[in-house]
Amino acid sequence: MSFVQIRHISSQINRKTVSIVGSGPSGFYTAYHLLKKSPIPLNVTIWEKLPVPFGLSRYGVAPDHPEVKNCEETFTTCAEEFSSPTNQKHKFSFVGGITIGKEILLKELLDNQDAVILSYGCTGDRKLNIPGELGTKGVFSSREFVNWYNGHPDFAKDKRFTDFDWSKVSKVGIIGNGNVALDITRVLISNQIDEIWENTDISSLALNLLRRAPVKDVKLIARRDFVHSKFTNKELRELWELEKYGIRGRIDPKFFQKEMFDPSKYDRAFNRRVEMCSEYLKPFNERSKKNYKKAPPPSSGYDKFWELDYLKTPLKINKDDFGAINSLSLCNNQLNEDNSLQPLKDVNNIMTYKVDLLITSLGYAGVPMPEFSKLSIGFDKDHIANKQGRVLTSSGEIFPHLYASGWIRKGSQGVIASTMQDAFEVGDRVIQDLVVSGALSLENSIDLSNIKHTTWKDWERINKNELLRGKKEHKTRSKFLTFEELWNGVEGI
Amino acid sequence: MLKIVTRAGHTARISNIAAHLLRTSPSLLTRTTTTTRFLPFSTSSFLNHGHLKKPKPGEELKITFILKDGSQKTYEVCEGETILDIAQGHNLDMEGACGGSCACSTCHVIVDPDYYDALPEPEDDENDMLDLAYGLTETSRLGCQIKMSKDIDGIRVALPQMTRNVNNNDFS
């Protein structure tokens, strides 16, 4: 283990100091933009609470979407270039394993740095707030479930997952209609198709448990209707295309028929979604376009199903004598013309779905840092109060030198590319302010000599070791699954 | 003349700028503008991440980029290079967040209608990403999916003013 002190000894170049909290796509794209665009020399430090970088790219993106993680290559090139002593203009440091607000206070960063950017993402779960949501075996939030199969050290060996009896999971309910809900559907319905998963960086521990589940039916349950589904066409198409494995998608005609949607009233993306669904719902040989006939279902037919289910409100999670989920009570919703939603709770509108596993995928919630109230930093419901990235105090004034980018700035919406654009825009404002502000001092430093942490070099070793382990297991990467393994991974396997 | 596909009514203005640029500067094919980067200390290989081959004499293909500030740049390139490779090799402001694997829309370009039909039709996966592109037009494509060929020698593409990926939910 290396304990490198990062006290920045001032050289001839007077660099302004910038600290970024969080090393996911928003934090790293902000750093990248600053280092690429700033006309004045900068000393940029990214702080990450885990010993390893990349946040949701590493622990959120589905294992079968490795191309989405390619942004990590840009971050790596950026880190290597500016960590190198030969680069005379800017300087970059990564500090992992340190939580801002714990080992080092946000106040300390604010006192020491010329600018601080909060890019720590959305770390909480939105809840259903219904009976049985907490404490029932087999009920997980999407954040927990995704972190678990992606090998996040907080969840990879969590007993709630490892002690759960996966061999009884045949029917699954997923509440929510975003891309995360589709990712989870894909993982669960194709859990036994090894060619999809075995070479990916999915946690082997999770995959082995998931494989035991004889999943037959996955219902994606939404409060609103087909028009309001939030997932994107790419992810939906991936689900339809699983039909070559005998996995069939369904939508009840009362929720979807092509004729319900007048193309002139909708945008291109939605009209393409309507065409996709109406074509895929037809029997294979009756489809009109060749792109919906890429690979036929197996001759044995379909034996697993996923279904888009609409206009329902979950009311109660029911459990068996052992505390495991066995069903979900719901009611129908009425969607009014003004777009308001009305749950219909009379006896004719209440139903029960038998489910063996329930994932709530209602979106990630932004959480304020513990020091916010003391420092009078504003927080609006699920994101930091800000004006174009400049953080506001609780009374609405600009908080000097403090910025926010990514999901914690705007809430948990959008793909990596939108986060990137947001990071660039906030980065431009930081540069704008830094160019005109006087430097705080020449010797801004935070002494890390007595605090255990990882550096970029340490991450390079962990990375190398994970790739090496992966090679032995015929996977792209085999992640270290606990904090202990990660810290030890700096040294060797 | 470019038709603008209006997505939720928010994108027309930005698309118009690029469309206007393509319309109003047809004779500027050979004009190149140089922009200077302010790098007082050292030049950085980090900014130069493309790996472009030099075309053999007589086999050069031309491409013109219309940049966000309205300036134009023309390059001579090899057959087979993608527009994303070319833009990155010349330090133009085009990201390829997914590394050119058609999994994001950060390399969205607006193709001159005169060249659009000469391109092979976009596949579903490209269209799925274009659905999310900001400032989408009827001649929008992803730079990573267009390879230079003799058929499109002289192609002109505009970089949209913004590359932010949006979906309907961003506006709700």
Curated annotation (Swiss-Prot), chain B:
Cofactor: [2Fe-2S] cluster
Tree of life domain: Eukaryota
Cofactor comment: Binds 1 [2Fe-2S] cluster.
UniProt entry keywords in alphabetical sequence: 2Fe-2S, Electron transport, Iron, Iron-sulfur, Metal-binding, Mitochondrion, Transit peptide, Transport
GO molecular function: 2 iron, 2 sulfur cluster binding; electron transfer activity; iron-sulfur cluster binding; metal ion binding; oxidoreductase activity, acting on NAD(P)H, heme protein as acceptor
Binding positions for [2Fe-2S] cluster per the UniProt entry: 98, 104, 107, 144
Subunit structure: Interacts in its reduced state with the apo form of ISU1.
General remark: Present with 14800 molecules/cell in log phase SD medium.
Task performed by this protein: Iron-sulfur protein that transfers electrons in a wide variety of metabolic reactions. Involved in heme A biosynthesis and in iron-sulfur cluster assembly. Transfers electrons from adrenodoxin reductase ARH1 to heme A synthase COX15, a heme protein that catalyzes the conversion of heme O to heme A. Required for the de novo synthesis of Fe-S clusters on iron sulfur cluster assembly protein ISU1. Interact in its reduced state with ISU1 to productively deliver electrons for Fe-S cluster synthesis. Essential for coenzyme Q biosynthesis.
PANTHER family linked to this entry: FERREDOXIN-2, MITOCHONDRIAL, FERREDOXIN/ADRENODOXIN
Family from the record: Belongs to the adrenodoxin/putidaredoxin family.
Protein name per the record: Adrenodoxin homolog, mitochondrial
Protein's organism: Saccharomyces cerevisiae (strain ATCC 204508 / S288c) (Baker's yeast)
